[in-house]
Amino acid sequence: MNEVVAKKYVKAILSDVKSNELNAFVENLSELAAAFASDKFKSIISLPTLKASQKVEFVLSLVKNQDAKFANFIKLLGANKRLELIPAILDEMKIEQSLLENTYRGEVVGNFDLSAEQLKALEENFSKKFNSKIKLDGSKSDYNGVKVELDDLGVEVNFSIDRLKSQMSEYILKAI
């Protein structure tokens, strides 16, 4: 339910904010969304004894570089008692921003560390394939192989060493 409401707010923001203001808007939302990681912050936002205007003042005090549009947006969220939607709005905003800029983020997961050159080569190849700018982050996990996930594009490419071993043994058994 929150995602649907967040999408409506994002649509309204995008119709009013110019492209050069969009990055600042996303940065401000990122600062606020980071505050939602704190349980104290969440409890302050959800306190029924605080007035909406006090909550809005508190939230706006956390943002360093705010403009009038951003302040009005936060005031609107506060008046509608939807300040807790800020992280969901940020997620939707990042998705829309990546669509507008044709830039997507992904993750490379494997049981070994990839060098910066390897990541860059993967980024270039995927960028050519999808005619977009792809930025990949590498992470190490228990996965026995390599997996590239581009969630925004709905793409997952994986190579499993275990699967390769089983397919090779099947092929050898069939050949015999």
Swiss-Prot record:
Is Ribosomal protein a UniProt keyword of this protein? Answer: no
Where is this gene product found? Cell inner membrane
Q: Which domain of life is it from?
A: Bacteria
Is Calcium one of the keywords? Answer: no
Alphabetical list of InterPro entries matching this protein: ATP_synth_OSCP/delta_N_sf, ATPase_OSCP/dsu
- Predominant place of localization: membrane
Record-stated family: Belongs to the ATPase delta chain family.
Q: What does this protein do?
A: F(1)F(0) ATP synthase produces ATP from ADP in the presence of a proton or sodium gradient. F-type ATPases consist of two structural domains, F(1) containing the extramembraneous catalytic core and F(0) containing the membrane proton channel, linked together by a central stalk and a peripheral stalk. During catalysis, ATP synthesis in the catalytic domain of F(1) is coupled via a rotary mechanism of the central stalk subunits to proton translocation. This protein is part of the stalk that links CF(0) to CF(1). It either transmits conformational changes from CF(0) to CF(1) or is implicated in proton conduction.
User: What is annotated about its quaternary structure and interactions?
Assistant: F-type ATPases have 2 components, F(1) - the catalytic core - and F(0) - the membrane proton channel. F(1) has five subunits: alpha(3), beta(3), gamma(1), delta(1), epsilon(1). F(0) has three main subunits: a(1), b(2) and c(10-14). The alpha and beta chains form an alternating ring which encloses part of the gamma chain. F(1) is attached to F(0) by a central stalk formed by the gamma and epsilon chains, while a peripheral stalk is formed by the delta and b chains.
Please state what the protein is called. ATP synthase subunit delta
